[in-house]
Amino acid sequence: MLQLREPQMVHKHLKLAVLGIVVIFTTYFIISSLSSPTSTHKTEYNSPKLQLAKELELNSNWKELGLNFQPNKKYSLPDESTLRQQLSYQFPYDESKPFPKNIWQTWKVGIDEKSFPKRYLKYQQTWEDKNPDYKHYVVPDKQCDLLIEQLYSQVPDVAKAYRIMPKSILKADFFRYLILFARGGVYTDIDTVGLKPVDEWISNSEMILEKKNRSGLVVGIEADPDRPDWADWYARRIQFCQWTIQSKRGHPMLRELIAKITDITLTRHKKGQLKKVLGKNEGGDIMNWTGPGIFTDTVFEYMNNILQSPEVFKNKKKWATIIDWKLFTGMEQPIAIDDVLVLPITSFSPDVNQMGAKDSHDPMAYAKHMFSGSWKDDGMPEMEQ
């Protein structure tokens, strides 16, 4: 009898042990599934895209009060070519440094020449008077050429692209990006008037909407045409102006813009198309070669690159448009996306009496463009149709 009961007891204890193990593992997996989301859900939840959506939901009145969005994680494109590597090496970006106290302007001749227009003397003086602590440069065209040759001697493709541009308006556009990338500060057209000291611009404040100001690039709205025929008048639905730009030395957006313009120029040169109009007209061609079209596109691309998930770059997944013109249309206060600060139309385009722009006395009015159109008479041969 004892020999029969002993195996039964062992079998009973074994069943209890197995049952206990099953219960323990089942409980563990249930608790794990409830307390720890999968890596996919975690990545999606923490993605900059969803962070931005949550921020906009919490700040539904961002267009009236402004926005300062700083993603917890940001991803940047790796250097795609030796040109970008050369630019990054020669002019490294340090966002911790303040904006350089430089003001850059250009004109055909030097400011001491008799042929320098008197009205431009008056305009440029407003920048000097309001910014006595700044170095103010009014660079004549010939000096622009020499300066770019010197600054970009170690990036020969860029120097060549600038040198072979067939029209002075193309060079004038390219120069502003090149000088800001190499030296930083404020670039402003010679036909602009300074309304407030640069040190009083919101871009130079320590905080923006109770968050640390990390601005490295400052752009303003040029056009916000809320009308069905906007494409007949402007290159983009929201267009950033490039008659006044503030930037720190080596900003990555300018690096991408310079690389694009260099590639376009050298490709056109190789194909014998430097003087050909490749767009629907000469104005449109310039807009998308060096002007507000390509400038606006590159600013948007930079902001969107910051907000992409890492899988986009690692696995070459589809690039998503997270930020477009809808975020900025109708804005009345600054919007910061990481280190890009976008100013409302009033900041650089007051008194235009349209698209929501206010007058020159508004607190957000920093500079006024007088629209002299001096670049139109550039003394260069006409481009071929």
From Swiss-Prot:
Location of the motif DXD motif: 189-191
Chief location? endoplasmic reticulum
GO molecular-function annotation terms?
Answer: alpha-1,6-mannosyltransferase activity; glycolipid 1,6-alpha-mannosyltransferase activity
List, alphabetically, the Pfam families matched.
Gly_transf_sug (PF04488)
Reaction catalyzed: Transfers an alpha-D-mannosyl residue from GDP-mannose into lipid-linked oligosaccharide, forming an alpha-(1->6)-D-mannosyl-D-mannose linkage
Say which domain of life the source belongs to.
Eukaryota
Documented EC number(s): 2.4.1.232
Q: What happens without the gene?
A: Results in a temperature-sensitive growth defect, cellular aggregation, loss of outer chain elongation of N-glycans, hypersensitivity to a range of cell wall perturbing agents, as well as to constitutively activated cell wall integrity pathway. Finally, leads to attenuated virulence in a mouse model of systemic infection and affects inflammatory response and the efficiency of neutrophil phagocytosis by the host.
Gene3D superfamilies noted in UniProt: 3.90.550.20
Q: Which cofactor does it need?
A: Mn(2+)
From the Swiss-Prot or TrEMBL record, state where the protein is found. Answer: Endoplasmic reticulum membrane; Golgi apparatus membrane
Which GO BP terms, alphabetically? cellular response to heat; cellular response to starvation; filamentous growth; filamentous growth of a population of unicellular organisms in response to starvation; N-glycan processing; protein N-linked glycosylation
What's a single GO CC term here? endoplasmic reticulum membrane
Keyword list, A-Z? Endoplasmic reticulum, Glycosyltransferase, Golgi apparatus, Membrane, Signal-anchor, Transferase, Transmembrane, Transmembrane helix, Virulence
State which ranges are Cytoplasmic (membrane side).
Answer: 1-15
Transmembrane parts of this sequence? 16-36
> Which segments sit on the Lumenal face?
37-385
Q: Which family does it belong to?
A: Belongs to the glycosyltransferase 32 family.
Explain the purpose of this protein.
Mannosyltransferase involved in outer chain elongation of asparagine-linked oligosaccharides of the type Man(9)GlcNAc(2). Adds the first alpha-1,6-mannose to the Man(8)GlcNAc(2) and Man(9)GlcNAc(2), but not Man(5)GlcNAc(2), endoplasmic reticulum intermediates. Represents the first enzymatic event required for synthesis of outer chain mannose linkages on yeast secretory proteins. N-glycan outer chain epitopes play a crucial role in the host-fungal interaction, virulence, and host immune response such as interleukin synthesis or phagocytosis by neutrophils.
What's written under domain?
The conserved DXD motif is involved in enzyme activity.
For this entry, the protein name equals Initiation-specific alpha-1,6-mannosyltransferase
